[in-house]
Amino acid sequence: MSEIKEVDVLVIGAGPAGSTAAKWAAKEGAKTLLVDKKSEIGTPKRCAEGISDENIAKLGVEIDPRCIARRIEGATVISPDNTKAKFTHDNIDKNITGVVLERKVFDKLLAVDAIREGTQTMIKTEAISMSRDDDDGC
């Protein structure tokens, strides 16, 4: 069954970037649709759970305490060839602090924020095709 929806903004993928883009588009008044093929937003568990306090501030987001698994000071990055790089206040010029996120909770709360701003959502839905109406000259 194909479902046709007319929207101003179509966002494919309800990860952090998609949900945040949908939230801001809807907040600015765009008729927004967020589509995700997974049956549950935030699953399966994804990588990239650590984020520094500095980058949180740059993003301009407030992290809900329910999303925080633990606070961190520094980090060790391990590459595919097992090379390790350690980042702590002892070996770089600034103190790195941040959080490890519960991505399942974090991703869901970002999607809820988008919905609260007026975003329509379709989960367990794969985007097959789309067309663009160029009436505005774009």
Name each model feature, range by range.
Residues 2-17, 33:
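Beta1/beta-strand and adjacent pyrophosphate-binding region of the FAD-binding site
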Residues 5, 70-73, 123, 136:
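Short, basic and Ser/Thr-rich N-terminal targeting/leader segments
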Residues 10, 26-46:
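Glycine-rich FAD pyrophosphate-binding loop
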Residues 19-20, 50:
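Short alpha-helical segment within the catalytic ATP-binding CA
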Residues 42-80:
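N-terminal FAD cofactor-binding segment of flavoenzymes
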Residues 77-138:
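Conserved N-terminal helical subregion
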